[in-house]
Regions:
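Structured-RNA-binding interfaces characteristic of tRNA pseudouridine synthases
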Residues: 1-266
Length: 266
């Protein structure tokens, strides 16, 4: 059967998600785990594919892959035990015939987290609305010969604790597009730019692209296929890994705060 799996990962210890010889990647680890439990031998024959690639340092909450296997139950029940701690499956589905995780997606949603939250959240949210609709995003991405036009379905900026969150949904995105959009919105939040600048960049595309925000704030948040995924229990190993990362970064944040000079900006 063709099995679709939804999974999550921390991106900071991977050289991106796409398989690359000699480098640790999400796809490489996932395929190796599938081979170890013998749900398939050759990823090409199994037609292994993911919904899309993420760059080095970018995280995913709901990435999706699919592959052909005669042992779907083994994949569902065992895969989390053999995957490394920074990748874990969260759901499975038997998709309809002709399903492809990349081309069957109705929409994709990303979130970019800003810390500390800029002061002008309302202005950022208003500016984010300018992105909605179909536009030429040449100023916000490297199209690499692809059509630079994309249709943004929804965009908003809101507070979540001490963070500002930029959430954007589209049918598809160009390379580094969300991170460059985040850069401009952060400038709006600090008062260095405004919605009119975004309107200009969309109306008058330029080869001098906006710089990309750092990858660690970006999460592939969700992908909509119009189908329901059945839950998969997270493995104890990944649960411990998540708890360990939370403790580590909480302590590091405290240390950075205590070690910073008194005239620090944060």
């Amino acid at each position: 059967m063709n099995l679709a799996l939804r999974f999550s990962y921390f991106g900071d210890r991977f050289s991106g998600s796409q398989m690359q010889p000699g480098l640790r990647t999400v796809e490489g680890e996932f395929i190796e785990a599938c081979r170890r439990i013998q749900v398939f031998d050759d990823w090409r024959e199994a037609r292994f594919a993911t919904a899309g690639r993420t760059d080095r340092g970018v995280h995913a909450r709901r990435q999706v892959c699919s592959f052909l296997t005669d042992l779907p139950e083994r994949a569902i029940q065992v895969l989390n035990r053999v995957l490394p701690g920074d990748i874990w499956c969260t759901g499975w589905a038997e998709p309809p015939e002709g399903f492809h995780p990349r081309y069957s997606a109705r929409s994709r949603t990303y979130r970019y987290y800003f810390f500390p939250a800029p002061e002008k959240i309302a202005a950022m949210n208003d500016a984010a609305q300018v992105f909605i609709g179909r536009h030429d995003f040449s100023s916000f991405a490297r199209s690499s010969g692809r059509d630079p036009e994309r249709r943004i379905l929804a965009a908003r900026v809101f507070l979540e604790g001490r963070f500002a969150v930029f959430e954007v949904t589209a049918e598809s995105f160009l390379w580094n597009m969300v991170r460059r959009m985040a850069t401009v919105l952060e400038a709006v939040g600090s008062g260095e730019s405004d919605a009119a600048e975004i309107e200009r960049l969309l109306a008058e595309p330029t080869e001098q692209r906006v710089a990309a925000a750092p990858p660690w704030g970006l999460i592939l948040w969700d992908i909509d296929y119009g189908m329901t995924f059945n839950p998969i229990q997270i493995d104890v190993k990944s649960g411990r890994y998540l708890a360990s990362r939370l403790r580590y970064h909480a302590v590091m944040a405290c240390a950075a705060d205590r070690l910073a000079p008194d005239d620090r900006a944060v």
